[in-house]
Design a protein with these regions (language model features):
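Internal nucleotide-binding/catalytic subdomain
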Residues: 152-200
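ATP-dependent adenylation/nucleotidyltransferase module used to activate substrates
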Residues: 1-152, 162, 170-173
Length: 200
């Protein structure tokens, strides 16, 4: 029986790195994917650094590493929408749209087209199967719960998603990273608009 193939979105952060590590330890056929959604020539957007760290993590875990260029799609689907909202004094949440339209739409579709069964991320959320289908639950760490940012996902999207650290507190995720020797175990959590960095 073949192993379930999972494409993990590696962001360069510790959460996605531990997610990839745990899935590999559990026997899944794991690969890593890095999404390029925005890039600049200055230091305002850390895409190049994040990609280098993600690549280093994948090499350490001895798993394949792929990059996906979604710059054009991200600008059309997310950036224009949220910046128009800002102009109207609205505060659309970029992470909700990014998760719905990029990570669990474009990235998921790419994964499926290459023969993967599911995509995984380092979100602090959980998925439960019940009589009505699938339900999105909060992560066990109340300070890190990210279920709100995933609240617009469809059941189809959830059926092909995995959140390997949703049942863990952040402190335990850090400890797993340290014990596993992950190269980004002490890296600080990212800040700023999804994939863009600081916006004035």
């Amino acid at each position: 029986m073949s192993k379930k193939k999972v494409l993990v979105w590696l962001s360069g952060g510790v959460d996605s790195a531990v997610s990839a590590y745990l899935l590999k330890e559990q026997g899944y056929d794991v690969s890593a994917g890095f999404m390029i959604n925005y890039i600049t020539d200055d230091d305002s957007c850390p895409t190049r650094v994040d990609m280098a760290v993600a690549r280093e993590v994948a090499a350490y875990l001895d798993i394949p590493f792929f990059t996906f260029d979604f710059i054009e799609e991200y600008e059309k689907r997310v950036l224009k929408y949220i910046f128009e909202g800002y102009k109207q004094w609205l505060t659309p949440n970029p992470d909700v749209f990014c998760n719905t339209w990029i990570k669990f739409d474009l990235f998921r579709e790419e994964a499926l087209s290459y023969g993967y069964d599911a995509v995984a991320t380092g979100h602090y959320a959980q998925i439960r199967t019940n009589n009505d289908g699938l339900s999105l639950l909060r992560g066990v760490d109340p300070e890190k719960d990210q279920s709100y940012f995933l609240s617009a996902l469809s059941r189809e999207q959830l059926s092909q998603a995995m959140f390997p650290i949703g049942h863990l507190p952040k402190s335990e995720v850090r400890e797993i990273a340290r014990k596993a020797g992950l190269p980004n175990a002490e890296r600080k959590d990212s800040q700023g608009l999804c994939f863009v960095g600081k916006v004035n």
